[in-house]
């Protein structure tokens, strides 16, 4: 093989893998695997446009990890599927005038072709397609199991409604008041919806964060989204009525600074407390607030609006009367839907009070002397209580305890823990999704469909465009809607909402090893063998939706005896994002990179290698058109080296370089620092070929094995050329470094400060200037002189001297 033809090599080995079933598991293979390792990556939504280079980046990085684990001797199960239901597919089908039942199969076929072409080791024997009745039958089963567990509830609630998509959209899908799918302004509606009670698991989900090996930014996002708050429920008696307004606050220490109350527009007391003089104004304001989406109402920088409802309540500590207002900056979903407004110490309350000329009172000061004067902004720092009567001089923490104790003694407060997390609304008034398996009966109410009657098939509708009724298009298929009640046999009507696509993806990983059976959703033996998932790689953007929902479903199934583990993914890593020539890649910028063209020109291995060379996998990198030539040249030189290889043994210097490379590559690949892995392999090849020397097979075999996760086709070809008959991935061939040979030579160099020798440090040939300075600062004698002034200049000659100029 004097020349390297990617097209020929890749076609040959993809065909060979298919013929031999190299990447496939039979049911027996799954059952008998000795070292099972489940390597999962997020399954894609199969768009009509196909995969773009960002997708290829993500899937290649995950495949590199899976192939590495296989070379370490694991039986790596790496399935792939398609998240094909949902509003994206439906909207595109409406746009092009094609039924989604016809559109999705061709999209999946194209995605499969692209995924095969990049050479990933997917097990195509175990795929899932969320639109397949054999899959969504079990999604409906998941719903029923959660229903049996008391974790499903139908209730009326304010929701974000997109008038263009004509369906409910989650808070997370509203960006700056616009629907993320179509950019239409979102409004608020009160609609009966099906909810999954994820809030029952809020604390469990928080506690579990401590025990899973996930990307820190993903765990932080989940922690913030769940949003645990410790505080108190406090009752404010309503003047002239024998009832109270209950508020939840995390700052009971500031109660003496509460100068007015605010109710959310949806709060039932708004209507009950509004007097006749204010009713017309209040009702108009409430209607206006309903037209706003829930997420936009949370923006801190929104102008504050509201109106007094004509009522007062009493501050339970000071006895002062406080006017009761209604404003859209208070949300019914958080706390009790009512707040005690403390404008002196809350920025939103301060802005509201300033807008409507309401009193602002300081009750927290940095020290006891700083308790007077006009407040020009809210003070949100720590300090001592002031202007708080008997509580003056207490710290914030002491004030919280003392005030709650006094209120509790008078039955006006109770300590509480609340969460930002809301229950998960799964109802969608669209066509393209799994029908929710519920039947309504006038006598029996909402009745779950018996498991034996699953799946509730989604009928083919030729007219599936949603309308303004708020009902799903399925409601127009009266024949489908009409059915018998499973309990009494009387007339029944099917639920016409379909479920959120995030329910499809909340459990798909559980199904992968069980696709060989249609009798049950989860094969107990297979689930015990292969789950929880060992490694999961995907996008950080799914931190608070898919990943949180998957954890919830898994915990619920564990609690009800379906699973014997409570966390679905032992390890999760969020991959980085690519840019192009320094600019974000997007359709609007016209700089989307199509992988098919790249692979046709350069070959899949070169594309894989280049993408992984762009930067640490968890950070991403910048795609440069000219950058791909370097990886291409490297593969060509390696192929040429194999063609010219001798049977002799390597010399001692090359042997040491080999083991240092094995050591570095093994360490860096564990940290997903794929770019430095590739750099190390390139450097090693330079050492092996230095001065035009002929490489030995012994010197080349380790580099080929370590390259195999990145360039699997060429690695297989070169392995065969070196005389091996089996696949490079069959026998756990990952090399181990000899600690003695991998030792890096160290030597002492002098450290001069302002031209005078002040000490020495121990370095290697690879020690960087920054590392050398760190070592110098750790030397007490040197550090004394470095700290005497400001470092103005550093002159570092690797292996010789470190010279520092200090002012």
Locate the predicted segments by residue:
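Basic, alpha-helical terminal appendages of large translation-related enzymes
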Residues: 1-20, 25-34, 264, 279, ...
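Conserved oxyanion/phosphate-binding beta-strand-loop segments in alpha/beta enzyme cores
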Residues: 1-40, 70-79, 102-110, 214, ...
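Residue patterns forming the tRNA-binding/recognition surfaces of aminoacyl-tRNA synthetases
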Residues: 3, 12, 16-20, 95-253, ...
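Amphipathic alpha-helical
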Residues: 14, 199, 204-228, 264-307, ...
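N-terminal catalytic cores of NTP/NDP-binding nucleotidyl/phosphoryl-transfer enzymes
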Residues: 28-100, 104, 127-142, 249-250, ...
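Catalytic alpha/beta core of large soluble enzyme barrels
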Residues: 62-63, 75, 267-367, 372-373, ...
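Helix-rich, typically C-terminal accessory recognition domains appended to large enzymatic cores
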Residues: 148-160, 164, 228, 415-444, ...
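Alpha-helical recognition segments enriched in aromatics with Gly/Pro capping
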Residues: 311-334, 482-619
């Amino acid at each position: 093989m004097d020349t390297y033809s990617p097209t020929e090599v890749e076609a040959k080995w993809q065909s060979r893998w298919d013929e031999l079933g190299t990447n496939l598991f039979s049911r027996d293979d799954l059952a008998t695997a000795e070292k099972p390792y489940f390597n999962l990556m997020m399954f894609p939504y199969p768009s009509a446009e196909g995969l773009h280079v960002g997708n290829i980046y993500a899937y290649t990085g995950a495949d590199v990890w899976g192939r590495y684990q296989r070379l370490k001797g694991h039986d790596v199960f790496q399935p792939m599927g398609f998240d094909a239901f949902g509003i994206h597919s439906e909207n595109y089908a409406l746009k092009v005038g094609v039924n989604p039942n016809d559109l999705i199969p061709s999209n999946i076929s194209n995605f499969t072709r692209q995924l095969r072409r990049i050479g990933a080791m997917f097990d195509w024997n175990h795929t899932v397609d969320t639109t397949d009745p054999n899959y969504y039958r079990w999604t409906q089963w998941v719903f029923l199991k959660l229903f049996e567990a008391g974790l499903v509830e139908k209730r009326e609630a304010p929701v974000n409604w997109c008038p263009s998509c004509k369906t409910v959209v989650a808070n997370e899908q509203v960006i700056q008041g616009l629907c993320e799918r179509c950019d239409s302004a979102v409004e608020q509606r009160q609609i009966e919806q099906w909810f999954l009670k994820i809030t029952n698991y809020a604390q469990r989900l928080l506690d579990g964060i401590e025990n899973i090996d996930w990307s820190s930014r993903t765990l932080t996002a989940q922690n913030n989204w769940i949003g645990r708050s410790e505080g108190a429920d406090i009752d404010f008696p309503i003047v002239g009525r024998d009832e109270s307004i209950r508020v939840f606050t995390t700052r009971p220490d500031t109660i003496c600074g509460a100068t007015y109350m605010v109710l959310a527009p949806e709060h039932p007391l708004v209507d009950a407390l509004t007097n006749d003089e204010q009713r017309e104004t209040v009702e108009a304001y409430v209607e206006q607030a309903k037209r706003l989406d829930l997420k936009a109402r949370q923006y801190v920088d929104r102008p504050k609006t509201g109106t007094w409802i004509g009522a007062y309540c009493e501050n339970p500590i000071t006895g002062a009367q406080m006017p009761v207002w209604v404003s859209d900056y208070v949300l019914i979903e958080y706390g009790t839907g009512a707040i005690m407004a403390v404008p002196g110490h809350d920025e939103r309350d301060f802005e509201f009070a300033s807008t409507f000329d309401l009193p602002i009172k300081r009750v927290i000061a940095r020290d006891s002397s700083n308790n007077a004067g006009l407040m020009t902004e809210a003070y949100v720092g720590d300090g001592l209580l002031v202007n708080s009567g008997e509580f003056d001089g207490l710290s914030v923490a002491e004030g919280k305890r003392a005030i709650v104790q006094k209120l509790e003694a008078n039955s006006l407060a109770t300590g509480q823990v609340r969460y930002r997390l809301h229950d998960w609304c799964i109802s969608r008034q669209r066509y393209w999704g799994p029908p929710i398996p519920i039947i309504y009966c006038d006598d029996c109410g909402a009745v779950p469909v018996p498991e034996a009657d699953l799946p509730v098939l989604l009928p083919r509708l030729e007219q599936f465009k949603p309308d303004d009724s708020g009902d799903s298009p399925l409601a127009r298929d009266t024949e489908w809607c009409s059915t018998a009640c499973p309990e009494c046999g009387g007339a029944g009507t099917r639920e016409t909402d379909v479920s959120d696509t995030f329910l499809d993806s909340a459990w798909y990983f559980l199904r992968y090893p069980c696709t060989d059976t249609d009798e049950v959703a989860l094969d107990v033996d297979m689930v015990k063998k292969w789950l929880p998932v060992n490694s999961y790689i995907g996008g950080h953007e799914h931190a608070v939706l898919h990943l949180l929902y998957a954890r919830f479903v898994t915990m619920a199934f564990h609690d009800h005896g379906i699973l014997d583990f409570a966390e679905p993914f032992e390890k999760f890593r969020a991959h980085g994002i690519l840019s192009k020539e320094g600019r974000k890649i997007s359709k609007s910028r016209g700089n989307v990179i199509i992988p098919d063209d790249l692979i046709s020109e350069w070959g899949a291995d070169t594309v894989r290698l280049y993408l992984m060379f762009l930067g640490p996998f968890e950070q991403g990198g910048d795609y440069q058109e000219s950058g791909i030539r370097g990886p291409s040249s490297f593969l060509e030189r390696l192929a040429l080296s194999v063609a010219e290889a001798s049977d002799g043994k390597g010399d001692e210097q090359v042997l040491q370089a080999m083991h240092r490379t094995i050591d570095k590559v093994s360490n860096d690949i564990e940290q997903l620092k794929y770019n430095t892995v590739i750099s190390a392999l390139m450097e090693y090849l330079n050492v092996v070929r230095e001065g035009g020397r002929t490489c030995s097979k012994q010197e080349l075999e380790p580099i080929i094995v370590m390259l195999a996760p990145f360039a699997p086709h060429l690695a297989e070809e070169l392995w065969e050329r070196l005389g091996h008959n089996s696949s490079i991935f069959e026998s756990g061939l990952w090399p181990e470094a000899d600690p003695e040979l991998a030792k890096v030579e160290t030597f002492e160099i002098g450290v001069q400060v302002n031209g005078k020798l002040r000490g020495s440090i121990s370095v290697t040939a690879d020690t960087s200037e920054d590392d050398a300075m760190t070592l110098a600062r750790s030397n007490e004698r040197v550090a004394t002189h470095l700290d005497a002034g400001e470092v103005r200049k550093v002159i570092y000659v690797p292996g010789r001297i470190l010279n520092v100029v200090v002012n």
